[in-house]
C-alpha cells in the first residue's frame, strides 16, 4: 500500500502561503510528492501543562490504536484464508479506500465533538478502540477454537494409512463382528512387501482364518488389508507382523462412535460457515472504526505538537505528503531547507542520524517541522 508523511509548519502571513511554498518546493519541478491539505478543526487548546502531558499520552495511544488496526487487518486476512487477495478490498474506512480517506480527511464531529477538551477526545478514542481490541480477542478465540477443532478432525481423515482415521474407509462387511472367538484386524502393508503378506499372513500366528485377507484401500505407499483370526492369537500375530514390517492398526469397528465423529465434523463445518459471514462483517466495520480513530489520533498529535512548537495563537498548516518512493531522501532535504529556520537545534540532523541519551526520539525521527508517518502497509503475509 502506501506511506504518508503528515507534517505541519507555522502559517506565514497566511496558512495558504505556507501551503503554496510547500507545493512549489515539492511538486513544481521535481515531483517529489503528492500533497493534500490535512484539515484539523479549531480544537480546544487548554493549558500548556495539559498539552505537554497529552503529548506523551497521545504517543502511547497512537501506538495502541495502530496495533489494533493491524491486528484487525491481519485477522481478516487469516479468516479469509484462500481469498487473501480480496483482503485489501475489504479494508475500507467510511466506505472508501484508505488512501482516499486519508487524503480527504474530515474530522468526525459526531463521534469526537470539538467542544470537548483534547483529553476527553483522546479518552473517547481510547475507550472505543479498547472495546474493539477486547471484542477482537473474544471473537478470534471462539472462531480459532472452532477452526482448530475442525482442522484436527480433518487431519484425522488425511495423511497416510498408518496415521489417518480409517472410519471413512472401512465398511461393516469388512469385519467379523459380535463373535466370542474371532476378531478382524486391519493391517497396513507396504506395497513393496505385499507379495510377502499374501504368502505369509496365514502362518504369522496360529489360528488365522485362511483366505480371510482382502485389500480394502490403498495410498501411494501401502495397502490396507483385513485379516480374521482367533482372539487368543492376536498378541502373537501383532508381534510377528511387526517383525515383517506389517503395521497392525488399533481399530475397533464401532458404528456409534463413527456416526458421532461424522456428525461432529458436520456440526463444526456448519458452525464455521455460519460464523464466517458475521465475523467478516464485524471485522470490516471495526477495521473502519479503528482506522478512523487512528487518523484522528494523528490529527490530535499534529495539533498538540504544533501548538507546543509554534506557540499561540494557533496558526499552522497541516499537510499530507505521499512521497515518491524513489526520491524520499531528496524530499527530506527539500523539507529541511524549507523549514530549518524553525529550529536551530535541527542543524546537521539530516546528515548525522544518531541516538542522544535522555531523548525519547532518536535523531532521525526529529525534524524542524512537526512530522508523523502514516504507514498503510497493514498486512504481514506469512
Swiss-Prot record:
Alphabetized UniProt keyword annotations: Acetylation, Hydrogen ion transport, Ion transport, Transport
Keyword Cytoplasm recorded: no
Residues annotated with N-acetylthreonine modification: 2
Record has Transcription as a keyword: no
One protein family per Pfam: V-ATPase_C
GO molecular function annotation: proton-transporting ATPase activity, rotational mechanism
GO cellular component: proton-transporting V-type ATPase, V1 domain
Coiled coil region boundaries: none
Role played: Subunit of the V1 complex of vacuolar(H+)-ATPase (V-ATPase), a multisubunit enzyme composed of a peripheral complex (V1) that hydrolyzes ATP and a membrane integral complex (V0) that translocates protons. V-ATPase is responsible for acidifying and maintaining the pH of intracellular compartments and in some cell types, is targeted to the plasma membrane, where it is responsible for acidifying the extracellular environment. Subunit C is necessary for the assembly of the catalytic sector of the enzyme and is likely to have a specific function in its catalytic activity.
Subunit: V-ATPase is a heteromultimeric enzyme made up of two complexes: the ATP-hydrolytic V1 complex and the proton translocation V0 complex. The V1 complex consists of three catalytic AB heterodimers that form a heterohexamer, three peripheral stalks each consisting of EG heterodimers, one central rotor including subunits D and F, and the regulatory subunits C and H. The proton translocation complex V0 consists of the proton transport subunit a, a ring of proteolipid subunits c9c'', rotary subunit d, subunits e and f, and two accessory subunits.
Family membership noted in the UniProt record: Belongs to the V-ATPase C subunit family.
Protein name per the record: V-type proton ATPase subunit C 1
Naturally occurring in which organism (per UniProt): Xenopus tropicalis
Organism ancestry: Eukaryota, Metazoa, Chordata, Craniata, Vertebrata
Gene, per the UniProt record: atp6v1c1
Amino acid at each position: 500500500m502506501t506511506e504518508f508523511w503528515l507534517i505541519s509548519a507555522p502559517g506565514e502571513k497566511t496558512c495558504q502561503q505556507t501551503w503554496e511554498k510547500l507545493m512549489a518546493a515539492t511538486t513544481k519541478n521535481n515531483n517529489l510528492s503528492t500533497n493534500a491539505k490535512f484539515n484539523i478543526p479549531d480544537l480546544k487548546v487548554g493549558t500548556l501543562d495539559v498539552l505537554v502531558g497529552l503529548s506523551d499520552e497521545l504517543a502511547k495511544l497512537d501506538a495502541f490504536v495502530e496495533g489494533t488496526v493491524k491486528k484487525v487487518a491481519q485477522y481478516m486476512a487469516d479468516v479469509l484464508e484462500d481469498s487473501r487477495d480480496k483482503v485489501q478490498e475489504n479494508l475500507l474506512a467510511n466506505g472508501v479506500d484508505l488512501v482516499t480517506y486519508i487524503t480527504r480527511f474530515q474530522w468526525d464531529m459526531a463521534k469526537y465533538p470539538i467542544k470537548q477538551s483534547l483529553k476527553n477526545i483522546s479518552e473517547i478514542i481510547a475507550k472505543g478502540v479498547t472495546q474493539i481490541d477486547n471484542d477482537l480477542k473474544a471473537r478470534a478465540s471462539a472462531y480459532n477454537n472452532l477452526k482448530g477443532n475442525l482442522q484436527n478432525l480433518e487431519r484425522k481423515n488425511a495423511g497416510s494409512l498408518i496415521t489417518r482415521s480409517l472410519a471413512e474407509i472401512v465398511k461393516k462387511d469388512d469385519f467379523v463382528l459380535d463373535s466370542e472367538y474371532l476378531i478382524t484386524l486391519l493391517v497396513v502393508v507396504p506395497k513393496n512387501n505385499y507379495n510377502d503378506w499374501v504368502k505369509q499372513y496365514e502362518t504369522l500366528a496360529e489360528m488365522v482364518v485362511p483366505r480371510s485377507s482382502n485389500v480394502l484401500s490403498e495410498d501411494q505407499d501401502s495397502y490396507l488389508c483385513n485379516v480374521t483370526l482367533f482372539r487368543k492369537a492376536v498378541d502373537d500375530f501383532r508381534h510377528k507382523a511387526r517383525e515383517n514390517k506389517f503395521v497392525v492398526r488399533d481399530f475397533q469397528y464401532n458404528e456409534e462412535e463413527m456416526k458421532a465423529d461424522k456428525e461432529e465434523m458436520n456440526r463444526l463445518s456448519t458452525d464455521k460457515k455460519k460464523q464466517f459471514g458475521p465475523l467478516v462483517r464485524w471485522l470490516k466495520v471495526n477495521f473502519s472504526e479503528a482506522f478512523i480513530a487512528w487518523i484522528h489520533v494523528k490529527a490530535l498529535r499534529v495539533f498538540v505538537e504544533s501548538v507546543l512548537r509554534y506557540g499561540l495563537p494557533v496558526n499552522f498548516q497541516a499537510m499530507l505528503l505521499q512521497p515518491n518512493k524513489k526520491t524520499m531522501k531528496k524530499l527530506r532535504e527539500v523539507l529541511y531547507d524549507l523549514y530549518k529556520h524553525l529550529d536551530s537545534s535541527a542543524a546537521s540532523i539530516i546528515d548525522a542520524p544518531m541516538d542522544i541519551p535522555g531523548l525519547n526520539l532518536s535523531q532521525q525521527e526529529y525534524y524542524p517541522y512537526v512530522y508523523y508517518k502514516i504507514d498503510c502497509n497493514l498486512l504481514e503475509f506469512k
